[in-house]
């Protein structure tokens, strides 16, 4: 119960665009079969239909779409992609309500029916398809409706080629070329002129007035459609203007405006601070400074002996005062001298509240006065 199909599927350039090829699956068996298609590269191919039913002695065309590649493959590239067509005989099973043949396949497989496989190898060809010219003629002819030619039977009988009444343009052209060759070779059977005349007169060409009428009707329809579009655009623009004016009125009337506070004027010129006063006569200041300096230098030698004399007197008086503080007799011990220097406190406990510290003898007042005078003179003369 296997199906019949070609063992190779050829794809032709260009591969940067989507390629479409057909697989003809034929059922030579006396009973119907179901099939499904599998591939080793599901991301590269799209199969329509990928499952279905084939009646006895019938053929189903399976469309295979190859996704576009980023660049053309190398000339020596070998494609390893494959397709697998599985078939299964279903006998008298009812498939009138079957929508998904994959589920129906699963049900039949559970019944233990035999499965037959047919493998198809993909081939990327570097040459153009051999029937590309035929396909181009076919695409050109299918764009125009078939023309019914009267007297084609007579033409066919005269040249020995069977032709249908509703012959297409390409078949009529082939028959005409065959008749021409046949006549040029000296065949005695000559087609009468009336036959050719009736043949070409049957292809009625529409009158120019009819064509003009059709063109006029088309122009009128286009003009009416254009007027409708213009009317709709004008209506929409008017509606937009009305809505815009209403929104502006709401903004002007209902939204409160912020209170405007007076702004202080800010001067653009920066403030100018007056420079410090500069003495007008610098020479007078310099002369005054030089005069004071000369006076100080002249007084300094005169005051130096007096300062030395005062310092000598101060030193002698200081030594005498320190010597007078010592005991007259040298026989006193250091302990007695320390006891004299230490402060004495009253021994009477009753007078402890009124007791006072007895101070040791210090620097005499006259020495303090002399020291103050010396420091005053030094500060006056040198500072």
Curated annotation (Swiss-Prot):
Residues with the Phosphoserine modification: 236-237, 259, 261, 268
SUPFAM superfamilies, per database record: PapD-like
PROSITE patterns named in the record: MSP (PS50202)
Cited Gene3D superfamilies: Immunoglobulins
Record's subcellular location: Endoplasmic reticulum membrane
Cross-referenced InterPro entries: Ig-like_fold (IPR013783), MSP_dom (IPR000535), PapD-like_sf (IPR008962), VAP (IPR016763)
Residues annotated as domain MSP: 1-123
PANTHER family attached to this UniProt entry: AT11025P-RELATED, VESICLE-ASSOCIATED MEMBRANE PROTEIN-ASSOCIATED PROTEIN
The protein, known as: Vesicle-associated membrane protein-associated protein scs2
Native source species: Schizosaccharomyces pombe (strain 972 / ATCC 24843) (Fission yeast)
């Amino acid at each position: 119960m296997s199906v019949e199909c070609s063992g190779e599927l050829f794809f032709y350039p260009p591969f940067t665009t989507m390629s479409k090829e057909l697989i003809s699956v034929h059922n030579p068996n006396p009973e119907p079969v179901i099939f499904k298609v599998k591939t080793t590269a599901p991301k590269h191919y799209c199969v329509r239909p990928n499952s279905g039913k084939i009646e006895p002695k019938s053929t189903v065309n399976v469309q295979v779409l190859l996704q576009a590649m980023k660049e053309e493959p190398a000339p020596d590239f070998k494609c390893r992609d494959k397709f697998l067509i599985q078939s299964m005989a279903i006998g008298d099973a009812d498939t009138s309500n079957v929508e998904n043949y994959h589920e129906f396949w699963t049900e039949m497989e559970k019944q233990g029916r035999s499965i037959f496989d047919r493998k198809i190898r993909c081939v990327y060809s570097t040459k153009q398809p051999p029937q590309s010219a035929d396909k181009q003629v076919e695409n050109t002819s299918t764009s125009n409706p078939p023309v019914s030619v009267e007297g084609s039977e007579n033409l066919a009988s005269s040249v020995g080629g069977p032709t249908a009444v509703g012959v297409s343009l390409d078949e009529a052209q082939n028959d005409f070329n065959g008749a021409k060759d046949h006549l040029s070779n000296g065949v005695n059977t000559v087609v009468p002129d009336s036959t050719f005349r009736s043949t070409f007169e049957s292809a009625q060409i529409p009158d120019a007035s009819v064509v003009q009428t059709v063109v006029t009707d088309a122009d009128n329809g286009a003009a009416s459609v254009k007027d409708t579009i213009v009317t709709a655009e004008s209506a929409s623009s008017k509606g937009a203007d009305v809505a815009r004016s209403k929104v502006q009125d709401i903004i002007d009337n209902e939204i409160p405006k912020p209170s405007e506070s007076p702004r202080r004027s800010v001067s653009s010129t920066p403030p100018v601070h007056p420079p410090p006063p500069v003495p007008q006569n610098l020479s007078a200041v310099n002369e005054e400074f030089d005069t004071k300096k000369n006076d100080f230098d002249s007084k300094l030698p005169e005051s130096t002996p007096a300062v030395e004399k005062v310092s000598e007197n101060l030193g002698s008086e200081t030594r005498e005062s320190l010597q007078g503080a010592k005991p007259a007799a040298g026989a006193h011990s250091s302990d007695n001298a320390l006891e004299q220097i230490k402060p004495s406190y009253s021994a009477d406990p009753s007078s402890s509240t009124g007791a006072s510290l007895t101070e040791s003898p210090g620097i005499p007042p006259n020495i303090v006065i002399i020291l103050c005078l010396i420091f005053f003179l030094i500060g006056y003369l040198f500072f």
